[in-house]
Amino acid sequence: MHTDLDTDMDMDTETVALCSSSSRQASPLGTPTPEADTTLLKQKPEKLLAELDLSGPPPAPGVPRRRGSMPVPYKHQLRRAQAVDELDWPPQASPSGSSDSLGSGEAALTQKDGVFKVMLVGESGVGKSTLAGTFGGLQGDHAHEMENSEDTYERRIMVDKEEVTLIVYDIWEQGDAGGWLQDHCLQTGDAFLIVFSVTDRRGFSKVPETLLRLRAGRPHHDLPVILVGNKSDLARSREVSLEEGRHLAGTLSCKHIETSAALHHNTRELFEGAVRQIRLRRGRGHAGGQRPEPSSPDGPAPPTRRESLTKKAKRFLANLVPRNAKFFKQRSRSCHDLSVL
C-alpha cells in the first residue's frame, strides 16, 4: 500500500514539474510535448477518466439527469438544426381520430376507422325525419344524438360481423341555409338515400332530378344511391306501386327498397344495406381505380349549352314505360338486393 501511495505522489510531483516547465517555455496552447506524453502514459486509466469532465456543467437542482445511453428527444434533435417554437409543435393524435375539418385527410381516416356518413335527401313531408329518428331510437344498439345537432344521429352497428360507426344526416332542408347544407351533403356523403312517399306521385316524379343533382355535384365518384319508398303501410293511399319504384331504380342504376318508418318496417335493412353498398363501391373503386378526369389532347372542348335538370328528369320519366319491358325487368331484378352491386 505504501508503494502505491509513493507512486501516486511521484506522478503528481512530475505532473506539477511538467506544468511549471511548460509555463516557463510558453508553449503554444494545445501543443503536445514529449514530457507530457510520457507523464500521461504513466498515469492509470482510472485516474485519467476521473480528471476528465464528461458531464458538462452541473445540472440545475431538481432537474433529472439523462443517461448517456438515453436518446435525445426527437423534438430537440430538430431544434439543433433549426429553431422550433413550442407552440407550433403538433400535438399528439387523439385515440378517437376525430377532427373538425372535412378534408381529404379526414376522409381517409374515416374510411380506415369504419365511419360511414349517410345523407337523407328528398322532398319535404316524405318521412326523412321520421326515418332518422327511427334509426337513432332503434333498441338493442348504442345510439345517441350528436352534440349541437338536432338532425344528426350516430350509432355503432354490426354489419356482416363487423362493427361500424354509421352517421345519418337529415339536413337536406334547413330553411335559408338549405342551399349551403345541400352542397355540404354532396361533398361529404358516403351514400345517399333519396326518400319519396308512395302516397305522393308528384314527389316520386322529382326523384330523377334529385339524383341528377347528386351525380352532377360529384361526377367522378361511384356514389351508392338507394331509392326509398316510404309510408308503405298506407296501402289505401298508395299512388306509386312497387313495380314502378323498381323500374325507376333500374333505369337510374340505383337500389330500391320500401319502408315504413312509423312501423319500423325495413328500417334496419335499409341502413345496414347502405353500409354494404358503401363497402361494395369502395372495394370496386380500389380494385379498378377511380375514373380519370375527362381530357382531350386537342385542348378543352368548346362550350356547349347544358341540358337543364328539369329536361333531363322529364326524359328519364318518359322512359319509365320502356319499349323492351323484358330488358328492364332483368335490369331491375336485383335492384332490391342491397347486398350486391
Swiss-Prot record:
Annotated GO MF terms: GTP binding; GTPase activity
Start-end of Polar residues biased regions: 18-30
Pfam name, any one: Ras
Listed Gene3D superfamilies: P-loop containing nucleotide triphosphate hydrolases (3.40.50.300)
The UniProt record lists the keyword Cell wall biogenesis/degradation: no
Predominant location: membrane
One cellular component term from this protein's GO annotations in UniProt: plasma membrane
Modified residues (Phosphoserine): S27, S296
Ranges of compositional bias, category Low complexity: 90-106
Bias-annotated ranges (Acidic residues): 1-13
UniProt biased composition (Pro residues): 294-303
Residue span of region Disordered: 1-71, 84-106, 282-309
Binding site for GTP: G122, E123, S124, G125, V126, G127, K128, S129, N230, K231, S232, D233, A261, A262
Keywords, sorted A to Z: Cell membrane, GTP-binding, Membrane, Nucleotide-binding, Phosphoprotein
Localization per record: Cell membrane
InterPro entries for this protein: P-loop_NTPase, RGK_GTP-binding_reg, Sigma_54_int_dom_ATP-bd_1, Small_GTPase
Similarity section: Belongs to the small GTPase superfamily. RGK family.
Stored PANTHER family: GTP-BINDING PROTEIN REM 2, RAD, GEM/KIR FAMILY MEMBER 2, ISOFORM C
Function description: Binds GTP saturably and exhibits a low intrinsic rate of GTP hydrolysis.
Name of protein: GTP-binding protein REM 2
Organism: Mus musculus (Mouse)
Gene: Rem2
